[in-house]
């Protein structure tokens, strides 16, 4: 049995367009493997006139992010806007609306993480940010779920590409 999850997205620049392309290419495989059919239906953008990937064309684009947040059909909002100041408020509003948020925004988590996680807990939803860590390598979920019987006391190393670049 397949469960359908409807996604909304905030931001559709280079990374957002790639996300749409990969989702379209891998949607059937994801459904076959996980039993979850991911449908992206609405995308909030800053500039409706900007050129985007052809795959984006079948979605409803809006320059009013409230239309994404307030859409009752949307289960999860993917934040790929890349900004921090305006995005913080958007993510807070989304969490307050009872929707989980997935973000790859390192700066957002670094600057507003405690506030956002508190709001997610209060609203009973998830704020997922694994794409913002260790160059997107899935490490947080294995630490939290696969090693639940182990006591991980520390992780040492340079854990992101940005730091590697700055230090080299």
Indicate residue ranges for each PLM-predicted region.
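General beta-strand structural signal in soluble alpha/beta enzymes
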Residues: 61-63, 70, 78-79, 102-104, ...
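Conserved anion/nucleotide-ligand pocket segment
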Residues: 145-168
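Charged, alpha-helix-enriched surfaces in structured cytosolic catalytic cores
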Residues: 14, 134, 138, 150, ...
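Conserved hydrophobic residues forming the short capping helix/wall of the S-adenosyl-L-methionine
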Residues: 27-31, 120, 147
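N-terminal glycine-/serine-/threonine-rich beta1-alpha1-beta2 phosphate-ribose binding loop
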Residues: 1-97
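Short conserved micro-motifs on helix faces and helix-strand junctions that flank
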Residues: 10, 95, 102, 157-158
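Rossmann-fold NAD(P)-binding glycine/threonine-rich loop
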Residues: 81-97, 104-145
């Amino acid at each position: 049995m397949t469960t359908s999850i409807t996604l909304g997205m905030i931001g559709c620049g280079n990374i957002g367009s790639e996300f749409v392309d990969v989702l379209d290419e891998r949607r059937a495989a994801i459904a076959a493997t996980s039993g979850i059919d991911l449908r992206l239906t609405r995308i909030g953008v800053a500039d409706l006139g900007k050129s985007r990937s052809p795959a984006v064309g079948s979605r409803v684009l809006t320059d009013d992010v409230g239309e994404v947040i307030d859409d009752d059909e949307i289960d999860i909002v993917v934040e790929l806007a890349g900004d921090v100041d305006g995005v913080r408020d958007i993510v807070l509003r989304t969490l307050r609306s009872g929707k989980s948020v997935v973000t790859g925004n390192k700066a957002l988590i670094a600057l507003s993480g405690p506030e956002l996680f508190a709001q997610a807990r209060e609203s009973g939803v998830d704020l997922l940010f694994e794409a913002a860590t260790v160059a997107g390598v899935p490490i947080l979920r294995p630490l939290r779920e696969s090693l639940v019987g182990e006591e991980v006391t520390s992780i040492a190393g340079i854990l992101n590409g940005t730091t590697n670049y700055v230090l080299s």
